[in-house]
């Protein structure tokens, strides 16, 4: 390219950047009643670099600097955060915000479910899951799940040393999948699970980035996503061929396929698998880690378990739903772990201009609420950074109540439909493994990673444990 050509290109590039900046500046000026805005020198990128380094810490720093409501411009999106409890009802109940619009793009990027397909089936799928996994039907899962957990724990032997997160993952995954999908439907046995496990863990670990970025920037993650989608074509076919006539004998996957009626079945099935693993397994890890690390809590838990199942840890027990009701302190521990390691953010899309306090939030903004920080409100949770299961004695646990200020399962029309099943499976697994084995921590309990906004917080480092049969 000659000198004239280089100068022409430079001038063109400069004018383009200048025009983009003017458009960005003008956009900000059109909203004089908008909340304080954190952006950057480059219009599309905005605060992405600062936000991405440690998003959880960034949110709290921004709240301290800007106040209760503020907007972050990042990666071409406007993220408006509400951080005070008096504004949360607007987040959950306003007709000017929409959950489905907020998550549709992420569903497309992670599972290739089109807007049309999502709009057609999402509400029906949610309502089916909510009913099938509701409190009145949990007894249908208990016996089989208890047996599956027993079988998985047999592989641990009588003693060993392992990273606690890996131990939980390998002990829970196949049991829950066999329970919800049907035995032999998904790869779960040790001869076939290795390749699947590699792809699924890569898909899970990259899910947050995959929900936001083009696949061309995440080639390894994209490869695993499409490998899993291809696998689920055969999973769906197998489940359809094995479908029983009796409605109560069908697995949750088979009920999902009935609801979808041919609409993106492999794609929704992959999301169902991810949803069944992505939050319950980390929370089980945190629950066990917090219990084992506190001598008083550990002793109290063991006293409670032995009062229900006697003191013979080697005895095989089948846990029923009525047994779980006799373990309230264990449930307190689970709820406290969920509180401490709640999702970084949940979101709604503003579809009509929204007034919060004296601010006007324009349509198109993503309205954000950080459950992680909401659960550190000292009004509801004194000493919020401490693991204090006793605080949950105030909640009516036997009536499935939660403490005021606790919002881990969301709110409004689309709360987590599998929340009661998740609490049951975590409580059952924790009861079985603590009853069967005595644990010793070899590492301190790790901090949570500050990088995750989607889903339960992940551990920042390893947590090695030693275990032996009781």
Model-derived regions: residue spans:
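Conserved cytochrome P450 K-helix/beta-meander segment immediately N-terminal to the heme-binding cysteine loop
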Residues: 369-397
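Cytochrome P450 heme-binding "Cys pocket" and the immediately downstream C-terminal segment
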Residues: 297, 419-457
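Cytochrome P450 heme-thiolate "Cys pocket" and heme-binding signature region
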Residues: 394-426, 451-453
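Central I-helix of cytochrome P450 enzymes
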Residues: 253-310, 337, 368, 418, ...
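Cytochrome P450 heme-thiolate monooxygenase catalytic core
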Residues: 139-283
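Cytochrome P450
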Residues: 25-33, 81, 104, 108-149, ...
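Conserved cytochrome P450 K-helix E-x-x-R motif and the immediately C-terminal K′/meander segment
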Residues: 48-60, 312-358, 368, 378
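N-terminal membrane-proximal hinge/A-helix region immediately C-terminal to the signal-anchor transmembrane segment
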Residues: 2-115, 405
């Amino acid at each position: 390219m000659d000198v004239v050509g280089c100068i022409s290109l430079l001038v063109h590039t400069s004018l383009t950047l200048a025009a983009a900046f003017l458009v960005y500046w003008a956009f900000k000026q059109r909203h004089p009643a908008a909340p304080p805005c954190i952006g950057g020198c480059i219009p599309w990128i905005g605060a992405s670099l600062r936000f991405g380094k440690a998003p959880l810490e960034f949110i709290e720093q921004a709240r301290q600097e800007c106040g209760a409501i503020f907007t972050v411009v990042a990666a071409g999106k406007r993220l408006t955060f509400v951080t005070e409890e008096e504004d949360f009802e607007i987040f959950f109940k306003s007709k000017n915000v929409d959950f489905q619009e907020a998550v549709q793009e992420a569903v497309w990027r992670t599972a290739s479910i089109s807007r049309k397909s999502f709009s057609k089936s999402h509400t029906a799928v949610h309502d089916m899951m909510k009913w099938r996994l509701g409190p009145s039907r949990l007894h249908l899962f208990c016996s089989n799940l208890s047996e599956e957990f027993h079988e998985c724990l047999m592989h641990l032997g009588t003693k060993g040393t392992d990273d606690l997160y890996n131990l939980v993952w390998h002990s829970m995954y196949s049991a829950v999948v066999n329970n919800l999908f049907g035995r032999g439907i998904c790869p779960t046995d040790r001869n076939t699970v290795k390749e699947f496990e590699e792809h699924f863990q890569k898909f899970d670990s990259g899910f947050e980035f995959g929900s936001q970025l083009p696949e061309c920037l995440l080639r390894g993650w994209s490869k695993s996503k499409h490998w899993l989608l291809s696998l689920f074509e055969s999973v769906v076919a197998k489940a359809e061929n094995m479908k029983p006539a009796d409605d109560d004998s069908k697995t949750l996957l088979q009920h999902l396929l009935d609801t979808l009626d041919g609409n993106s079945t492999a794609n929704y099935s992959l999301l169902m698998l991810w949803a069944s693993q992505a939050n319950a397994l980390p929370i089980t890890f945190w629950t066990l880690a917090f219990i084992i690390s506190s001598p008083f809590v550990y002793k109290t838990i063991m006293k409670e378990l032995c009062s229900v199942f006697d003191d013979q840890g080697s005895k095989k027990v089948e846990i029923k739903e009525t047994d779980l009701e006799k373990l309230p302190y264990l449930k307190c521990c689970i709820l406290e772990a969920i509180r401490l390691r709640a999702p970084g953010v949940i979101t709604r899309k503003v579809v009509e201009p929204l007034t919060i306090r004296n601010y006007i939030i324009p349509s198109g903004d993503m309205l954000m609420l950080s459950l992680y920080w909401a659960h550190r409100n000292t009004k509801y949770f004194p000493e919020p950074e401490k693991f204090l299961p006793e605080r949950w004695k105030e909640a009516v646990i036997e009536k499935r109540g939660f403490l005021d200020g606790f919002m881990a399962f969301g709110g409004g029309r689309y709360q987590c439909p599998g929340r009661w099943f998740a609490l049951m499976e975590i409580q059952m697994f924790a009861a079985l493994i603590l009853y069967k084995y005595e644990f010793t921590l070899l590492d301190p309990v790790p901090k949570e990673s500050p990088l995750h906004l989607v889903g339960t917080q992940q551990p920042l480092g390893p947590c090695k444990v030693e275990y032996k049969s009781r």
